């Protein structure tokens, strides 16, 4: 398997959308979320799907319908990157899972456009070190409780979600006190997953899309395996 940690497995959605279901979770701890081809996040606790919307200089952009969405699974491991074209550049969503506080799904929004933007999340229980905009979502109809955060040019907003199932009091307190800015980055998660899947055994494959595919199959197997204990 290739040791190149920047290799990206790409799915283009510019023409016809190809359905996708990316399984996220903790190595050895099972899966706890699925990300679809548009960046919607569904936890395994039956709670509402987390959708995202971007307010750019011209209007609100809905990734579930925009033709400019492109999605990548970085190096084949469970770090999902969804790009949305907006005036002046891209708004980028990255989703991955960390083991902190019993397991958190981390969602990052990076503004690579030349102008400030805002992002709306359709759930009120996202964990963030920032305070949501008191004005809420203006000019778009979203589910009750949706929250909006500004994202300056060149900056990244990070939030997290915790599945409601199996949340003991100690874990709930840990979630309440978590500092999302100190959670591992998507680069760290990518490196950790690559190391784990490569330790499972080396496979010599041609350069290109095959190595990320092998990494995806191995990482999905680790997430979906039934614990023996």
What residue spans do the PLM features occupy?
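Solvent-exposed loop and edge beta-strand segments that line ligand/cofactor-binding
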Residues: 226-229
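Terminal accessory carbohydrate-recognition/targeting modules of carbohydrate-active enzymes
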Residues: 1-224
């Amino acid at each position: 398997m290739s040791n190149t940690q920047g290799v990206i497995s790409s799915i283009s959605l510019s023409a016809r959308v190809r359905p996708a279901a990316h399984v996220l979770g903790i190595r050895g701890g099972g899966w706890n979320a699925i990300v679809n081809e548009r960046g919607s996040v569904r936890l395994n606790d039956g709670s509402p799907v987390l959708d995202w919307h971007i307010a750019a200089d011209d209007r609100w952009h809905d990734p579930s319908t925009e033709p400019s969405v492109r999605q990548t699974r970085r190096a084949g491991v469970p770090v999902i990157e969804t790009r949305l074209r907006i005036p002046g550049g891209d708004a980028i969503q990255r989703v991955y899972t960390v083991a902190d506080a019993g397991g958190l799904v981390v969602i990052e929004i990076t503004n690579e456009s030349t102008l400030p933007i805002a992002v709306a999340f359709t759930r009120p229980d996202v964990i963030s070190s920032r305070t949501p905009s008191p004005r809420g979502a203006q000019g778009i109809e979203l589910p009750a409780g949706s929250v909006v955060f500004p994202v300056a040019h060149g900056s990244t907003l990070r939030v997290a979600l915790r599945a409601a199932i199996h949340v003991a009091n100690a874990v709930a307190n840990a979630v309440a006190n978590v500092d999302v800015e100190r959670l591992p980055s998507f680069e760290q998660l990518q490196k950790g997953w690559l190391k784990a899947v490569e330790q499972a055994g080396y496979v010599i494959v041609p350069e290109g899309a095959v190595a990320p595919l092998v990494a995806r199959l191995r990482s999905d197997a680790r997430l979906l395996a039934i614990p023996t204990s």
